[in-house]
C-alpha cells in the first residue's frame, strides 16, 4: 500500500478508517445530523451523535447503514465523503481504498459502496469480504490449506 492508501470498515454503528503506516486514523459513529427543512447535512460522526435529543424536531439523526450495507445512499455518500476528506489532504494523490463489506452483499449493494467511495475521491476501490479482512487483520495466512474459525461477537 502507498502512504495515502486507506482501508475502511463500514460498520452499522461505527466507521473506522486506517492508513498505511499510521494505523487507525478515524473512528466515528455511522450517523449524520440532517436539517429536514433544508435537506442539508449539518454534522457527521461524534458531532452528529452529540446532537441527538438536544436539537429541534427538524434536525434528525440518520444512521444510513443497516446490517453493514447501505440503506440510505445519499447519507452514506455524505458520511464517507466527510470522513475520507478528514483523513487525506487535497494536495495528496487520490487514495486507493479497500472497504470491508459483508460476505453476503448483493451486486447492487456493492455498486452503491463503490459509488459512494469514488464520490469521496478514491482513485480505486477494492471490496473485501469481512471474514477475509478479519483473517488478514488477525495475522492468518489465508493462502494456507488449514481450517480456521473467526467469530464476530459484535
What residue spans do the PLM features occupy?
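Nucleotide/phosphate-binding catalytic cleft detector across ATP-hydrolyzing
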Residues: 1-153
